[in-house]
Amino acid sequence: MTEKDTDGADGLTKAKSNAVSEDYETVNHVTGLKLAVIVTGLCLSVLLVALDNTIIATAIPKITDQFHALEDIGWYGSSYLLTICAFQLIFGKIYTFFPVKWVFLIAITIFEIGSAICGAAPNSTALIIGRAVAGIGSAGIFSGALIIIAYSIPLEKRPAYTGAIGGMYGIASVAGPLMGGAFTDHISWRWCFYINLPIGAVTILSILIFLKHPKQKLDNNQTWKARLLKLDPIGTAFFMPSIICLLLALQWGGTKYPWNNGRIIALFVVFAVLISGFIYFQIRGGDSATVPPRILKKRSIASGAFFLFTIGSAFFIMVYYLPIWFQAIKGASATSSGIMNIPMVLSLVVLSIASGITVTAIGYYAPLYYVSTVLTSIGAGLLTTFTTETSKGKWIGYQIIFGAGVGTGLQLSIIAAQAVLPLEDVAVGTVIMMFCQTLGGALFVSVGQNVFTNLLVKGVVNAAPGLDPQVVLRVGATQLKNMIPPQFLDGVQVAYNDALTKTWYVATALAALSVIGSVGMEWKSVKGKKIEPAAA
């Protein structure tokens, strides 16, 4: 590995680059039927995670009817997101210092236990606990699937498989409410969780049997205590409660408590103090930090994380609030509104796979960032033009444009991280990207909820004077035509349409802001070359 024609710093840099190249060459690359089984198992694991993000949405009315716990509605979703966000970054360190295969299998097992608790929950508290447990497992599944891809497939072929996994994530995210409605209407809401058990079992078996232990740089002479200390316990002690405080403030602010309430202010203050402590210890911690500064300083990592934060946030706003438009304005049932989302699903999946194949063919991923930003921004902007009379052709066409934009860009940041980082840093880089996507979705779905609720209340006061806005909020979108007096219905639908389209302004702004990440991305090729670490 010594370079005879160089010395000093240049020689050291070149030697490090060669070492990185050898890391990629000595990975246990998988081919043939074994690869097909592993990738299928990984896609199913991502299906589990993405489904659980949204499948409960259409089941909540039946759950609250059974448990008589209307006040717990917010916790059914937020308990899952809280533990995902709190544990996602720490999984990056765990995947770095412990065997990838076993960490992934443990994450799926935790998720399965949480799903079983949810399915068998005798009361609302048990359901919330089950959701939190499932969230812990979920925090390590999606990133783990991408890390296994990195260890199993050569870099130049990896984008196509990453695109397939991204497509599966998109399918499940949008199809979740549809499946939740179908299970709730025709079987039981409990099957929203029981369905995870056989799917997870298939994933566990496929990985357990067919995946060999990837060749990681693990120091097997280290004690478990020494490895645990490398997980940055001090940083984690600051990070986890900071994220919980932030998400609780956004969950409760403007709904359970007014924004100027002491509890909300205190949560934001505690978040600011704790996250400042976390940042301080990350800077001091160097390579031992949960988020090593040298990784975050790489242009492609910072730009890719920002891009995924904005595009992911825009996507989740549409996933949550577009079905409400179909229910409130078009009178669709929960199941039918999911079917009406199919144009977005199909375009997202097709473009996600196509963009992965394109990167594999041409080698460069940076140009597709611009395509994603443009299409997503145009699609989101067109969706904000909806009225109560919007035709079928428009709501289908606009969804296709938006879905195509999101599908093109959803997996690009993962590809970028794997292209610019040495293999031993891929786990942390991948988790940083996934964390930004998850956190963005959690934050801006809450922001969207506050924007929507406040505008709907004002809209009902103006468009349907004489009707109590709180009645409209309690009724829900699917029951408007049955529960709202006929003389108020047109005004309420106008108020709903106005509140939803203005909520989508947030998604449009986020999609437009993603251009910052696109412009900052380095032009690196994944084709026909050995991968060297990017300059910090």
Swiss-Prot record:
Disrupted-gene phenotype:
Leads to decreased tolerance to the azoles fluconazole, itraconazole, voriconaole, miconazole, as well as to the antibiotics chloramphenicol and thiamphenicol.
Q: Where in the cell is it found?
A: Cell membrane
Gene Ontology molecular functions: transmembrane transporter activity
What range does the record give for the signal peptide?
none
Segments spanning the bilayer are 30-50, 80-100, 102-122, 133-153, 163-183, 191-211, 234-254, 264-284, 306-326, 342-362, 366-386, 400-420, 426-446, 503-523
Family recorded in the similarity comment: Belongs to the major facilitator superfamily. TCR/Tet family.
The protein's matches in PANTHER family, at most eight in alphabetical order, are given as: MAJOR FACILITATOR SUPERFAMILY, MFS EFFLUX TRANSPORTER INPD-RELATED
- Name of the protein described by the UniProt record: MFS-type efflux pump MFS1
In the record, what lineage is assigned to the organism producing the protein?
Eukaryota, Fungi, Dikarya, Ascomycota, Pezizomycotina
